[in-house]
From Swiss-Prot:
Substrate binds at K71, N116, A117, M118, G119, F120, N178, N183, N243, T244. It is a peripheral membrane protein. Keywords: Cell membrane, Flavoprotein, FMN, Membrane, Oxidoreductase, Pyrimidine biosynthesis. Its EC number is 1.3.5.2. It comes from the Bacteria. Monomer. It comes from Helicobacter pylori (strain HPAG1). It catalyses: (S)-dihydroorotate + a quinone = orotate + a quinol. One of its GO terms (cellular component) is plasma membrane. InterPro entries: Aldolase_TIM, DHO_dehydrogenase, Dihydroorotate_DH_1_2, Dihydroorotate_DH_2, Dihydroorotate_DH_cat, Dihydroorotate_DH_CS. This is Dihydroorotate dehydrogenase (quinone). Pathway: Pyrimidine metabolism; UMP biosynthesis via de novo pathway; orotate from (S)-dihydroorotate (quinone route): step 1/1. The active site is at S181 (nucleophile).
Length: 351
């Protein structure tokens, strides 16, 4: 009831203005352990059936917040209090950049979806790392999503990813290389097996922390499988599928620029993930994101082979009790099917 009133006000504002107001509050809350604990007591949820050890990291539950919400790693402590099992900060770039011109964030309310053309706006890796350290350590694993600066030419992309990773080596529990945002010109062209192989070979030399590749939902299946295979062969520990889509047919009134996320992406993301899991389940860690807004969809992705999940748009539309609701219902679904833990359910449809 309370969030419905807050949501009505926020949705009366420009989407990015509303996001900035929420972020300001979350940054303030992050500075108060007392308030964070109060939030956790209200909206957190803990159940040993949902815990899992993955790549040496302890996840209280499989539900994470996707990159893009906390671009500068400045409100992580508050966000952990809303029931997430982990968070992904960023996207951080080596140098600060403003991103694309506003307006660049839009709601498609009927479809419970968002369209963003943000363009990796962030304060840069140095300030991002400083923000991260301010309230560390955190209660859950934190990933750092890394991107390429817009002004960097393709020929120097590898050097740019090396530079941003180097700035972030002493923060975060894992790293995600973002080659799949549609909002940086030609970035998706880097989704090819040669560049991906070079990228992960380079990163493996720099860190022992887990490395992930985030892929687009608009790749042809054969291309996607080839790119993922190249990443795994070069040392990637996991794949995050998927980023936003440029398929404008999924909403009634799309804007010209930007990628779509939310419920409009559910079917497309699920289909891509199904192909990914058929080929690579048990060969790497698979993370499913895109159009997950309830326990049923979350459970389906887990049974399809997802060790971890991420949400974003659903958090905007459903509010602070979303994680708690999904996780409570997920436990019921596990119990109904006789699973003693979420770990047992991972990939059940493939066995």
């Amino acid at each position: 009831m309370l969030y419905s009133l807050v949501k009505k006000y926020l949705f009366s504002l420009d989407a990015e203005d509303a996001h900035e107001k929420v972020c300001k509050i979350l940054r303030m809350l992050s500075s108060s352990p007392f308030l964070c604990n109060l939030i956790d007591s209200q909206w957190g949820y803990k159940n040993p059936k949902l815990e899992n050890e993955i790549l040496g990291l302890h996840f209280p539950n499989p539900l994470g917040l996707a990159a893009g919400f906390d671009k500068n790693a400045s409100m992580l402590r508050a966000l952990t209090a809303f029931g997430f099992g982990y968070l992904e900060a960023g996207t951080l770039t080596n140098e600060a950049q403003m991103g694309n011109e506003r307006p660049r964030l839009f709601r498609h309310i009927e479809e419970e979806s968002l369209q963003n053309a943000m363009g990796f706006n962030n304060y840069g890796a140095v300030l991002g790392a400083r923000s991260f350290k301010r309230f560390a350590p955190y209660k859950t694993p934190i990933g750092i999503n890394l991107g390429k600066n817009k002004h960097i030419e393709q020929a120097h992309a590898l050097e740019d990813y090396k530079a941003v990773l180097n700035q972030c080596l002493n923060i975060g529990d894992y790293y995600t290389f973002n080659l799949s945002s549609p909002n940086t010109p030609n970035l998706r062209d880097l989704q090819n097996k040669a560049f991906v192989h070079e990228l992960f070979c380079m990163a493996k030399e720099m860190t022992h922390k887990p490395l992930f590749l985030k892929i687009a939902p608009d790749l042809e299946t054969d291309d996607m499988l080839e790119i993922v295979n190249s990443a795994i062969e070069a040392g990637a520990h996991g794949i995050i599928a998927t980023n936003t889509t440029i398929d404008k047919s999924l909403v009634f009134a799309p804007k010209e620029m930007g990628g779509l996320s939310g419920k409009c992406l559910t079917k497309k993301s699920r289909e891509i993930f199904k192909e990914l899991a058929k080929a690579f389940f048990n060969k790497t860690i698979l993370v499913s994101v895109g159009g997950i807004s309830g326990a049923k969809e979350a459970y389906e992705r887990i049974k399809m082979g997802a060790s971890l999940l991420q949400i974003y748009s659903a958090f905007i539309y459903n509010g602070p009790n979303l994680c708690q609701n999904i996780l409570k219902d997920l436990v019921k679904l596990l119990q109904k099917d006789g699973f003693l833990s979420v770990k047992e359910a991972i990939g059940a449809d493939l066995r």
